Each structure stands twice: as C-alpha cells, then as structure tokens.
Curated annotation (Swiss-Prot):
The lineage of its organism: Eukaryota, Metazoa, Chordata, Craniata, Vertebrata. Residues 759-771 have a biased composition (Polar residues). GO terms for biological process: microtubule-based movement. Residues 356-385, 456-494, 588-683 form a coiled coil. This is Kinesin-like protein KIF6. SMART domains: KISc. The gene is KIF6.
Amino acid sequence: MVKQTIQIFARVKPPVRKHQQGIYSIDEDEKLIPSLEIILPRDLADGFVNNKRESYKFKFQRIFDQDANQETVFENIAKPVAGSVLAGYNGTIFAYGQTGSGKTFTITGGAERYSDRGIIPRTLSYIFEQLQKDSSKIYTTHISYLEIYNECGYDLLDPRHEASSLEDLPKVTILEDPDQNIHLKNLTLHQATTEEEALNLLFLGDTNRMIAETPMNQASTRSHCIFTIHLSSKEPGSATVRHAKLHLVDLAGSERVAKTGVGGHLLTEAKYINLSLHYLEQVIIALSEKHRSHIPYRNSMMTSVLRDSLGGNCMTTMIATLSLEKRNLDESISTCRFAQRVALIKNEAVLNEEINPRLVIKRLQKEIQELKDELAMVTGEQRTEALTEAELLQLEKLITSFLEDQDSDSRLEVGADMRKVHHCFHHLKKLLNDKKILENNTVSSESKDQDCQEPLKEEEYRKLRDILKQRDNEINILVNMLKKEKKKAQEALHLAGMDRREFRQSQSPPFRLGNPEEGQRMRLSSAPSQAQDFSILGKRSSLLHKKIGMREEMSLGCQEAFEIFKRDHADSVTIDDNKQILKQRFSEAKALGESINEARSKIGHLKEEITQRHIQQVALGISENMAVPLMPDQQEEKLRSQLEEEKRRYKTMFTRLKALKVEIEHLQLLMDKAKVKLQKEFEVWWAEEATNLQVNSPAVNSLDHTKPFLQTSDSQHEWSQLLSNKSSGGWEVQDQGTGRFDVCDVNARKILPSPCPSPHSQKQSSTSTPLEDSIPKRPVSSIPLTGDSQTDSDIIAFIKARQSILQKQCLGSN
C-alpha cells in the first residue's frame, strides 16, 4: 500500500502576443517546493482607497514555464505514473484549467508536428516499449475511450456504428453493484497488442470528439474525455494476475459566459461544462475536509467515473494549465486555488493482485491426476473398466496437440494407465493408415484429372488470350482518354487567366457558328460546372446532399472546389510540412534499411571468416601433431572486434529504424486526422454555399417548365453580379433588354430560354416593343454546337421550332 497526496504540477502557456503577458515569477529553490507568484495590478478606476490584493503565491511539485517542451512534461509527470501502472497500481493524470489554456495540447498533443505529441501517445509508446523488454511476464492491454458531453456518456471506439455525428454513438450508462463499484454499460474494451494498434484507436476516438470554435479558443473541446489503458500481467504457470488501469483525462475548459459572450448551442455546452466542473470542485472540497461523512460522487457522471482516482485506490496527478495573459489572470488564480485544494487529498494505492480461480482449479486437477498415476504405478493396480467417451476425446485432443507441436522436446503425458497408453498407440496407427490411403487416392485422382484436363487446356488458353487482348485494348483507350483530359485541363488553366472584361467586351458571343477559337470553346466545355453541383434548379436540389460525401463520390465540380478550398485552408501549410517531413523520414528509413542489410551481410561474412580461421588452425595443429596454441590469434581477435563493432552498429541502426517506424506512423495519423478535419469543414462550407445560392437566387426555368420571371432593377443587378462570378465555372448570362436574363449551363449543354413577358413586366419596360419582339430570339451564334454538321443543323432546327411554339403560346394567351 502506497499513501500519498495527489501530485500537482503547473504549466504556463505562452501568450499569443507578448504585450498581453501578465506579471508572474517562478521561484525554484531546491530546498523548498517551487512556487508561482502572480501579480494582479490594481485598477486605477477603483479609486484611491483600494485594498485589493495584488500578489498571489501558490506552491506546486514542479512548474513548467513557457519554454517547456512536451518531452520534459512527459518525463516528469507521466513517466512515473506509467511506471507504477506497470507495477500493478492504478494511475490517473488529468489536466484542469480554463478554455484555451493548453489542456488538450498537454494531454493529447498538437496535430502539426511529431514533437508536439502529448502525454497519451508518449505514454503508449513508453508502456509498449517496457512490455517488449520484460519477457518474464505475459501482458494484455485493452483500450477504452469515453466522452462525456452535456452529462451524457458516449463510446468513441464503438465498432458497430459508423458515426457521422456524436448522437450516432452508443450512450454509456453508469451501473453500481452492491459493493459500490462502478460499471460502465456500453463502453467497449479494445485489445491492443502493438503500439500501432493503440495509436490507431486513439486517432479513431479523436476524430469523433466534439470540437467547436469559441471566442477564447478556435478549437475548443466541448466535452470531457477519458482515455483509459487497462493492463493485466501474470507470470507463466502462475495463478496470480495483476490488474491496473491508467486514466488520462482531458477536461473541457471552464469559461465565464459574461466574459466570452457566447450564446445558443455554445451557451448550453458552457452551462454543462461549468456545472460538471462545479460538482468536481464540490467533491474535491469534501475530500479535503477530514470529518466529512458524505462525498457527493453521484452528482455528475464524471465524478462517478473518477471515484477511485479522486479519493480511493489510485496514484493521481493533476496538471494545472495556466494562461497568464492580463485578461485571464482571474481564471488562472482560480485554477491555482483549485490545485491547492486538490493537493490536500490523500489516496491509498493498493497493489491490484488477485488469484484466478480457473487457473487454480486446473492446476489442482492436474496435480490430483499425477498423484493418482504415481499411486497406480507404486501399487501395481491395473484397471479393467473401459474408458469413457470424455476420456477418449481428451486423449485424442492430447494426441492432436502433440502431433501439431513443433517442439522436439514435447511429451505426450497420459499417465501410467495402460488402457490410455494402448488407446494412444491404436489412434496413432489409425491416423498413419488414414494418411497413406488419402495420399494414394490423391495421386490417382490427380492422374485422372490430368487426363481429363488435357483437351480443355487449349480452349482455356484461347479464352485467356482473348481476355488479355481485350484488356490491353481497354487500357490503351483509357490512356488516350487520360491524355486528352490532361491536355484539356492544362489549356483550361492557361485560358482561365483571361481578363473578364475582355471576355465581356468581345463582340462575338460565345459558341458562334464557325468560331475559329476552339480553345475558347474547349475552356468553356471542359471547365467543371459549379452550377451542376450548387444545383439552383429545383429538380437537382434533392441530389445536393448526396453529392456532398466522401471524396470518391464527389462530382468533378465538387472535386475542383475541394482542391481550391484545401489550397486556401489554414491547415494546408501544416499538411505540406508533414508531407515533407514524412518524405524525409521515408528516405532515412530506406537508407537505414539498406545499411542494416549491409551490416547483416557483413556480420555473416565476418562469422564465416572466423569459422574458417579456426578450422585452419585446428587442421594445421593436427597435421603437424601440435596442440592448438593457447595464445590467441591476432587476426582472429581483430575479426572478433570487427564483429562486435558491426553488431553494435546493427543494433543502433535497428533501434533507430524502429523509432522511425513509430514516428512515420504517427505522422501518417496526424495527416489523416487533418484530412478528416478538412473534409468535414469543406462539407459544412459546401452545404452553406449551396443553401445560400438556392435562397438568394431567383427561380430559373428548366427545360420542361416555363414560368414568368419578374425582377426589379436592384435584383437584376444582384442576379447579374452573382452569375457573372460563376461565369468562369461554365455559366453564360445574356440580357435580352426586357428585364429578363437567359441562363444557360454551357458545360451541361442545356439552354434555358426565357419565358414570355407578363403584362406587368411590359409596363416596367423602359421602351414599349411589340409582343413578338419581346419573344427572346436567341442568335444562332449563341447556341452551343458540337462541331458535327448534321447534329448542329438538328439543334438549330429544334431551337427555331421551340421559339416559334413559345411565340404562338404567348400570342394565344393574349
């Protein structure tokens, strides 16, 4: 049993701007406990008589200043706790502080650089490294990840649900047994045999966490998360099992609503966060008071889950994260006061050992059977009754495991019962005979199959040859198509930089018959149409959300928009930097692999030389009837020293390669996490853009329906400006001079003719024109053509016939 108080540490976050830095000092006297002094200057607006306290001093186990890196924090805080967990004690590390003070960065780490890894990934690396070194015990590791959001628990690692939102995850409920032990229903435990599997589970859970932007923090975690490592160990053949668990807790940040001014959904989240932290503080105060008979653990889910960590069988450590900017000094002082109360709590950590009853029963049964066999051998008693079915099945299982065991020293232990010995010999004989019969049947069947398959081989070869030829043709066609598309894309990028005013001032409208500017038509026809994806047409609006999904389901326009969004995103620089680092690590790993192979071959060569040298000396001594000289051979000693040097070099490079492997996998996880975040933000942005375009844009006629289209001069100007911004994406806007606009999607090759003007729109027209003049007559040169003469003539005839029908309909209605 280990009795100790909760260890408290402080970490100071660097300020965003230096002029916002508050006044503080750190006293790290070796004879005394380090202390942090915060100076809160008096406000002159409070008047001349102001007795407000200016200096606040707090003591911690250690204080990490702004320049402390993640490695230093892990070595001094998490490593001792992880070592006690390996020894069989429970451990907890939790970070407490206001929002934006660096709790998530300390516990989980940053997503930008590998050196920014937090306590969780570094602890996983340390634990699995120690497990590999200790081969005297059998270890089993399980991972769980719990999120508490608005007083509801969610399992972030549930494999049975594909979570697109937090509500899709299964809810975790708290159950309590008669011994007042807490059990979490619906919280899954995932076994992790390697560090890579554990990091993958951490990455999976982090992608499902609730993160939102607040005035204090752009990526504020809006929930409490508890990452738990369950570790069990036992020695081979022993019935004693050690269990330990390590809670790594990332609390949501407290914030003063009056200061931040949040509202709506963020306000609801802030209420739940502040309430749960208030209940946590109540538990801390109750535990620090010696004569309190009741501890209010059940007030919140978080205090119920952390019952052992706060006042029970656990070695607990707290990290107070401080943001010592001028505007945050009050919250930082409050955090330090909370830490001082936490330091008064004393826990009693007990070694979690238990005896597995199943292993004890199995060991005792085996011991009883051995004693019975020894007794039968001594007394010479022979049993005559037949073996039971259970005994026969047990003997056959023993024989099967004996035959499958590759160990040459394995034994078939059936005791001194001659009935069992005879049955084992009979069973082995039966297995041998069955194997011979099976081999004979297999040989005969193979000979028959060869005779039958000879006529079919030629036909099968011919079919395979035809299929191969067909696949080659398909590949050639696809390659040609790819080259053409690449050429179109390059020309589109080249022509996309044309000045828009020159395009509008051009005398000839686009898609003129016989237009020699084929590159212009290629640009308009090959540029991805944002109109196809924003879908202002009513019929396509229902398909919008289906297109906003994973990258492989995106349309061409959506993919281009995603590339632009990714290029302009703030995380693109981080992703590119990680790509460069990953490329360097891959190159280094490749070079190390080659060096390791060279060292391995050199070690083998040196061993062979030493062996040959030794054989030559022995042969020389035998031929000359001389004993082997006692003095060591200098050449052999030199070879042995080279061999040892190569072994050390090989071991060093191999260790570095393993570290590189872990770093590469962590970088890949960071990149995957950034890509998932980028994808989610793009989906939100894309949906907002599509919704805004549908709300702000007027009704546009489809090919099958025509409706009156009325606009004021202001709305006409806004609509024209909106569509002119989309002209580079493939939209063509034409003002017919009657208060109407014709919109055609030149990529989709669809023409949306203007409807007949209503009488109201004719009154609004500046110049009165005859009714037949108001019918839009699209110039032939503005019709998008294909280049084929027959097809183009059919298109022109169809447009003329349609305009004639529209004109007759308008005349008939008037």
